[in-house]
Amino acid sequence: MIPGKYRSVSGRAANNVNCGLHLVIQTSSLSDKNKVEFRLNRETPPFPGRLLQHDLERNYSSRQGDHISLVSSSMPAFPILQRSSEEKTLYSDRLTLERQKLTVCPIIDGEEHLRLLNFQHNFITRIQNISNLQRLIFLDLYDNQIEEISGLSTLKSLRVLLLGKNRIKKISNLENLKNLDVLDLHGNQITKIENVNHLCDLRVLNLARNLLSHVDNLNGLDSLTELNLRHNQITFVRDVDNLPCLQRLFLSFNNITSFESVSCLAESTSLSDITFDGNPIAQESWYKHTVLQNMMQLRQLDMKRITEEERRVASVVPKKEEEKKRESHKQSLLKEKKRLTINNVARKWDLQQRVANIASTQDRKDSESPPQESCQLDGGNISAFPEEAGSLDAGLSSALQGLSVTETHLVEIDGETLSLYGSGALECLDRNWSVQTAGMVTTVSFTFIEFDEIVQVLPKLKMKFPNSLHLKFRETNLVMLQQFNALAQLRRVDQLTIDPQGNPVVNFTLWKYYVLFRLSHFSMQKINGTEVTQNDMIMAERLFGILAHVASSELPQYRMISILGDARKKQFRYLLESKGKKPGIICEETSDSKRFLGENTNRATLNYTTREFYHEKLEEIKDKKKFCRLYVEDLVKEATAINMKNEALQKLWPQMFIELVRDAVIEIRSKDSYMKLCLQQITDQK
């Protein structure tokens, strides 16, 4: 806004139009015959007091086509302006030449006392012929065709210069205008702010609707209170914090995308009114809070007054945003740690599988060697042990041992899913989980864990997470149908997902039907995301029903009872007792019930023994055999020694008998001495 003292001057000019003004056009010789005199139209529109208000550029776009052709620059003459004495007396300090279709500035003689000069809405291309107006304070050249700022060096008293809507490309030739208070350059083609650092008294600078891409070089404008930069191409702002008196800054409709590009505004202590509307930054959800947080002294934002409630919210939101950032950073760290841990677990798993494959190959080679005493379970050579290192690849073994123990497993609860990575994660089932957490888990995922190790913790899983209904297996070495038997000990399974990666069992065509048959008491709903239908259950029974019957019929009764749990032993005994009854005696309902119980019992005989458990049993059998062998060997040795002693006795006995008889005869040959000897022995014994 222009100071009131200039506003009043322009107002008077608007109300007191110079209606008696004469223009005299003459050649350079100034001869009387070449003079042409004409009078300006008395209905000339008054000067509307146009200043640097924010609507200065409102009609800019609509006026672009209003220009008409310029007077040829080769024209040798300038219009000469002359006014009567009466007019000079009435309007001594102002002159309005608005909308006169002027292409050049006329020569103004005898008007050195002018303080206001208005050339609005003409076709002037160059500022000239006004250097003699050294008392001029207000110069309005709005809406002309000026391409360069010139001809102003002598106007040292000029306070208001309005050059809006011209063709100026560069700010220049303002060195002598040190008293300039208002400078309007809106609607031009300026690309850079320059040559204004000496304007220490400038209070209003309007550069709206130009081609500025950045704002800087504002040092020295110590009195600037208003800066209008609307409708440019500005991407960043600098040096605004060096303007100690700046109160209003208008940056609407530019290309500002972040607060960092205008961060210098936060350092300004004088700004009270600022606009960002029409910028990409104004579309962001954090825009208003960020601006208010960094510029607490603002009174208006985007032409709207800032309330105390908005300030309060702005002071709270940053704390929440900071907490969100910290939480986001924490989550990022956790995700990265999770990723690294999973990669480490996967690498360890891969090394284990390669070591196991090498061990398996070595075992096959050993089996092709000369016959040795053996008693093995199929697949029992999958596990690799440290003592076999001599036959394993040394590089793989050392790499496996080099992995950190703390990085080889991961336990994660995400919503309703418990994810376990690595065999060490199974130890989490020994923790004291809260009732709420344990009850929330419905899905358990096993990754990079041997299935045989999982089997050992299934009873704990059933107790710790009673609501687990969905099991996922990925990279768990599920290689045969028999392994699915181990899942029967769980309480309930509604869904089962077996990832093909690391589980060769899914390559079997009928594996899903076997799962449905063996785990029929669970009434599963989905397998690998596919709904289970009644036809699937019927097909599973047809394919594998005979298998359970054969398995149960081949087992002795004592083995059957040992396999069944206590809860099923009574059912099994009931079935055995019912075999002797006639079919007609038992009602149809009872028969169906027994048949159902029998089917479950038959399926129970299809169990799974882990390789580790089998190896333990195998070692136990070997120990028993060894004990029996040693015991028998000791008995044989003892019997042999007894026999040898008996044979030696038989050889020595005849001679010993003769000696005994001889000693007895000699001893009793003297009856008295023999009796004394006997009495003496009796006495000695007492």
From Swiss-Prot:
Residues 319-341 form a coiled coil. LRR repeats lie at residues 113-134, 135-156, 157-178, 179-200, 201-222, 223-244, 245-266. InterPro entries: Cilia_flagella_integrity (IPR050576), Leu-rich_rpt (IPR001611), Leu-rich_rpt_4 (IPR025875), Leu-rich_rpt_typical-subtyp (IPR003591), LRR_dom_sf (IPR032675). The keyword Repeat applies. The keyword Transport does not apply. Its main location: cytoplasm. It is found in: Cytoplasm, Cytoskeleton; Cytoplasm, Cytoskeleton, Microtubule organizing center, Centrosome, Centriolar satellite. Residues 311-332, 359-381 are annotated as: Disordered. Residues 279-317 form the LRRCT domain. It comes from the Eukaryota. One of its GO terms (cellular component) is cytosol. SUPFAM superfamilies: L domain-like (SSF52058). Pfam families: LRR_4, LRR_9. Gene3D superfamilies: Ribonuclease Inhibitor (3.80.10.10). SMART domains: LRR_SD22, LRR_TYP. Subunit of the tubulin polyglutamylase complex (TPGC). The complex mediates cilia and flagella polyglutamylation which is essential for their biogenesis and motility. Part of the neuronal tubulin polyglutamylase complex which contains TPGS1, TPGS2, TTLL1, LRRC49 and NICN1. Interacts with PCM1; TTLL1, TPGS1, TPGS2 and LRRC49. This is Leucine-rich repeat-containing protein 49.
